[in-house]
């Protein structure tokens, strides 16, 4: 199904649903809460989701967003993700589960229905993941199917980074491209049939989680989906 929206900033948060510790702040989406002194609150998770559902059958989409990670130490945790899930998807466990998974089922692909591109600032030893900060593609599991190393100079830069995520409904390729103004470029892709995972309605949004010493902000966001049916004659 076709859907498009564009937020050059979040002066208006019409059609954004906030759950858990997420809230609108200074024309951004703040994914995890801070106290009255601006200090990140530990062990919290939040979602900011576009309210209107859409479907992925015979659909391609493209979304781009800008983000900043504000760190208050050299060991921040845990990161954030852009994710697709059914409309009733709740905020899940904080910490390394990124608000998207529960501890007892986090690595069980048959127990989850969520696909995400994660920006992981903390190495969790509880499950198999690289021993460095990374950007990854997650398919129904906290263990990423694709990862690329996220350079510390970018993680700690406080720069506004730009991420592009695209999905081709015909080739079933999900691609993420992330770029920093004075830093690295990151690209990763994975073949996954999203319409098979999600036969019904889905929503797209952001999930953030702490840890500590970190706050995640989304500064802008646009999205458009198109039907691939026209090409299938």
From Swiss-Prot:
pH-linked activity: Optimum pH is 6 for hemagglutinating activity.
A Gene Ontology molecular function term of the record: carbohydrate binding
Record: residues binding Ca(2+): 120, 122, 124, 129
Binding annotation for Mn(2+): 118, 120, 129, 134
GO cellular component: extracellular region
Pfam family, one: Lectin_legB
Metal-binding as UniProt keyword: yes
Glycan attachment residues as annotated in the record: 26, 108
Keyword terms of this UniProt record: Calcium, Glycoprotein, Hemagglutinin, Lectin, Manganese, Metal-binding, Secreted
Segments passing through the bilayer: none
Principal cellular location given in the protein's record: secreted
Thermal response of activity: Heat stable. Retains hemagglutinating activity after incubation at 100 degrees Celsius for 30 minutes.
Subcellular location: Secreted
Note: Hemagglutinating activity is independent of divalent metal ions.
Subunit structure: Monomer.
Biological role: Has metal-independent hemagglutinating activity towards erythrocytes from rabbit and human. Hemagglutinating activity is inhibited by glycoproteins fetuin, asialo-fetuin, thyroglobulin and azocasein but not by free carbohydrates. Inhibits ADP- and epinephrin-induced but not collagen-, fibrinogen, thrombin- or arachidonic acid-induced platelet aggregation in vitro. Has anticoagulant activity in vitro.
Family stated for the protein in its record: Belongs to the leguminous lectin family.
Protein name, entry field: Lectin
Provenance organism: Bauhinia forficata
């Amino acid at each position: 199904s076709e859907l498009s929206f564009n937020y050059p900033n979040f002066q208006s948060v019409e059609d954004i649903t906030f759950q858990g510790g997420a809230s609108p702040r200074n024309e951004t989406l703040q994914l995890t809460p801070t106290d009255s002194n601006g200090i990140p609150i530990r062990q919290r998770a939040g979602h900011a989701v576009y309210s209107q559902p859409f479907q992925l059958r015979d659909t391609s989409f493209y979304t781009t967003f800008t983000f900043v990670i504000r760190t208050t130490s050299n060991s921040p945790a845990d990161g954030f993700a852009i994710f697709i899930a059914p409309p009733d998807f709740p905020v899940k466990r904080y910490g390394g589960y990124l608000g998207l998974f529960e501890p007892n089922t986090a690595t069980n692909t048959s127990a989850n229905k969520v696909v995400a591109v994660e920006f992981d600032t903390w190495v969790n030893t509880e499950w198999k993941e690289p021993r460095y900060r990374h950007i990854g593609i997650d398919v129904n599991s906290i263990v990423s199917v694709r990862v690329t190393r996220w350079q510390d100079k970018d993680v700690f830069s406080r720069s506004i980074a730009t991420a592009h995520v695209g999905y081709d409904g015909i080739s079933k390729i999900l691609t993420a491209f992330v770029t920093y103004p004075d830093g690295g470029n990151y690209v990763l892709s994975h073949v996954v049939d999203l319409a098979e995972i999600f036969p019904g309605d889905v929503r797209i949004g952001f999930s953030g989680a702490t840890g500590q010493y970190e706050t995640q902000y989304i500064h802008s966001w646009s999205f458009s989906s198109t039907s691939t049916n026209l090409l299938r004659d």
